[in-house]
Amino acid sequence: MMRRRRLLLSALAVLAVSACGQPDTDMSNGKFATPKDAALYQAAARGDLAQARQLLAEGASLNSRNVRAMTPLDVAMVEGNRRAFESLLELGTDPTWLGDARDTSMHFAAKLPDSYWLKALLKRGFSTEVKNRLGETPLFPALGTSTQANVQLLLDAGANVHVRSKDGRTLLHQAAMIGSFDDIPRLLDLGVDPRAVNEAGHTFQRYFFMGPRNPETEKKVRAWLSVHGIAVEDQM
């Protein structure tokens, strides 16, 4: 899980360096799949929808993915380019499209610290329940210390907290596995099943008690489990 975060940060750093690049530079650093896609992004960044539509008619794609499996919409979010972002949505980009990638743009937005992107997508009515290749909804990548605003946005939009991934993980499992321990008391209060086991046969407690954690959070979790008659599994 931490490796995924490191890969995302690496992609953010590479794209930030090239944020002002022209189409040829964008191609050389792998930011876009084809020259037409690079030109499409540049047109969107200028707000030139007529030129962008012409490029789409000539074969450019809103759904192309670069060497990091990022769509033009993902690139816009990473670069902080709101004009490109809004233009691409106006042109018909679907942030719930998965294709052959691991994540949709909804998942990508959910893991970014700047909540502007996810808020904008939710405001446009895109689903909170779209699943990635692992069967995760955007709530899974939204968990974490730097993305609490995204968790709240998804909850406010009615996201299902009882969802499970293909390998049986609940949001409690996810929070414990990535070390986002402060999310756990809230998820318990929201009704996520603490008895649920994943494909490996473990409840979230297996991952919560196996590593370093905040003493105050641990105290809250132990108290919650005790009040609800659930045995503490701290002897692994």
Where are these regions (language model features)?
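C-terminal motif of bacterial Sec signal peptides marking the signal peptidase cleavage site
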Residues: 18-19
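Leucine-rich solenoid repeat scaffolds
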Residues: 194-233
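Ankyrin repeat A-helix N-terminal signature
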Residues: 42-47, 75-81, 108-114, 141-147, ...
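Ankyrin repeat structural motif
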Residues: 48-56, 81-90, 114-123, 147-155, ...
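N-terminal export leaders
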Residues: 4-9
